[in-house]
Amino acid sequence: MSDELVLQAAVELLEAVSRGSQRKKMERLIRPLEIALRKAFREQGSLLAKKLRQVKRYFAEGGDPFKQHDAWLNMKFSEALPPNEFNAIWAQVQLETVKLFAKPIDDAVAKALAYGGIGMLGELKMKLSFDLANPRAGDYLKEYGADLVKGVNETTRDILQTLITKANEEGWTYKRTAEAIIERFEEFGVGRPQDHIDSRAHLIAVTETGNAYEEGSRIVVKDLQDAGVDMEKSWSTVGDGKVSQGCKDNEAEGWIGIDQAHASGHQRPLRFPGCRCEERYRVKKSE
């Protein structure tokens, strides 16, 4: 092997070590965030089940007439619960639980953003600094957190609307409805092991820390470009059999300008929730 190839291999190894160190820090954020979101989903589900008592007029008594003490739990839907009334209850639940989601997400995203920026500076061997005082980082955190929690709650609401509709149509008792709600929120937290499905809590944690890490890297590169350094990027997959065709197509492009969209239309990973790809950057080589 020539000296030039040895040097290139050594440089690539150092870059990988630098990048890997910060990425490992980011990955260590995933588990604590997942646990916090699991707890948030459980508390949200329990609170919603309790607040359904506000619409008890939509339940008709049913079940064993000799068990009067259990009458409330055995009341069944007598007419459809109007969407506006359900939405009003859900709005109360969101308001009372928003901090359970927002704080752990905000904390993890901020750290992942910083790790991404610091890791990229190390990979590029730039003797510069990066922190959350960076204007682009501040803008990202300001816009991202509120939108994310809103998106999580909107998805939850849509899932619950389907459940409530089924309860209406099949005349479920309050007890059965409440149990189904709590069970659904439990699935949000821990998934369905029998189906080998990751939980929503895990997927959100992986996706949002990954997105923030990639954004931190991109912010550093955009700042360098603004300073007159000509940069380029390349999509990188993990290279196993689970990689989607869209990500393979992005990787096949090779090195492109940092403001050029990839074949999928994305500026950077993640292309979808749970995407395992990352963006590589370098100073553009002279022609």
Q: Which functions belong to the PLM regions below?
A:
Residues 1-191, 284-287:
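N-terminal leader/targeting and assembly helices and adjacent pre-domain segments
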Residues 194-287:
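Acidic, glycine-rich two-metal-ion catalytic cores of nucleic acid-processing enzymes
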